[in-house]
């Protein structure tokens, strides 16, 4: 059984799932930046043994739904934090959700 924890404040949206209330299986977190209605995607992490099982997609869909409801634009930089995650695979993943490259970062505008 997986437990969901969700935190929403004026400056943060975070969602995580853990198995039986223990160590998180996956985490997604975005935080507000100086510009109105813009947030920065701080983290999308899925533990290795849970990868390729739809967790990253689930988190993205949930985070993006909240952003669309609030009219939030998201900025992110692609940084594979481990050697076993390919940059191109991450880029393709984010593009699937509507992120577009602008300079060195990616932007996703809300769907209204």
Which residues does each predicted region cover?
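Conserved beta-hairpin
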Residues: 4-27
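A conserved beta-strand-loop-helix scaffold within acyl/acetyltransferase catalytic domains
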Residues: 19-37, 44
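Conserved acetyl-CoA-binding loop-helix of GNAT-fold acetyltransferases
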Residues: 46, 52-65
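Conserved active-site tyrosine of GNAT-family acetyltransferases
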Residues: 93-94, 99
């Amino acid at each position: 059984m997986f437990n969901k924890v969700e935190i929403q404040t004026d400056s943060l949206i975070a969602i995580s799932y853990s198995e039986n209330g223990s160590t998180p299986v996956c985490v997604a977190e975005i935080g507000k930046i100086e510009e109105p209605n813009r947030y920065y995607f701080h983290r999308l992490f899925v533990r290795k043994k849970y990868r390729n099982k739809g967790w990253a997609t689930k988190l993205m869909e949930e985070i993006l739904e909240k952003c669309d409801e609030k009219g939030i634009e998201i900025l992110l930089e692609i940084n594979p934090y481990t050697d076993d995650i390919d940059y191109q695979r991450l880029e393709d993943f984010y593009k699937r959700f509507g992120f577009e490259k602008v300079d060195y970062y990616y932007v996703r505008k809300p769907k209204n």
